[in-house]
Amino acid sequence: MLETERDNIRKHFLKYTRQAFQGLPKMESPHILDVGCGSGIPTIELAKLSGGQVTGIDVDQSQLSILNERIVEEGLSRRVFVRNCSLFDIDFPDETFDVIWAEGSLHIVGFEKGLKEWRHLLKSGGFLVAHDGIKDVSSKLDRVPVLGYKLVTHFALPEDTWQTKYFEPLEQLIQKWRNKAKTPETLSLLESYQNEVNMYKMNPKENVSAFYIFQKT
């Protein structure tokens, strides 16, 4: 299945998910919100790392359906939950979560908007972990205290990570499937993947990213 093979490429980034998680203090059975979870590559990993409860939210029901299948396969039905929910209107009670995890979703919502609007969802002293670009990072981090957080730590991914671990393998995957793709759905996926690659090639230096750990103050 094409989407499964693409997700296998995305698993190259789990080493950085694990590294970021190790930057958090030890918590017993934390409640984690995975914002923009997609098909749940980090979601499942977070459940295994934390031993706690993970709620994944996204608006793409097809991706959530894949995640639901993975939850059953991994035997995590009592600890991992999904909800079809907009990233711009997250409807949970105040102070529900110990950790908010955002791998790529701040890029969609906006750095300042995400930190500001998601803050009330965190318990006192809770953490927001974000995988985001490093463009304008100094000005972004200057705003963090004003938004009600402090920076705990951050680390950048190696500069060639996106090229060697994602876009080059993705391009190889596209070539592999191009001649055997038959269904409109598969052809549409291939087109979307190719668009990703094309956008990357237009400005590869934009695809340098880092993990940030913020604590609610």
Regions inferred by a protein language model and the residue ranges of each:
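Conserved alpha-helix/loop element of class I SAM-dependent methyltransferases that forms part
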Residues: 10-28
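A short acidic, Gly/Pro-enriched loop at the edge of an enzyme's catalytic core
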Residues: 88-99
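Class I SAM-dependent methyltransferase SAM/SAH-binding core
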Residues: 33, 39-89
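Class I SAM-dependent methyltransferase Rossmann-like catalytic core
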Residues: 1-12
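A short SAM/SAH-binding and catalytic strip from SAM-dependent methyltransferases
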Residues: 99-112
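Conserved Class I S-adenosyl-L-methionine
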Residues: 158-217
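A short glycine-rich, Lys/Arg-flanked "PGG" loop and its adjoining helix->strand segment in the class I
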Residues: 112-127
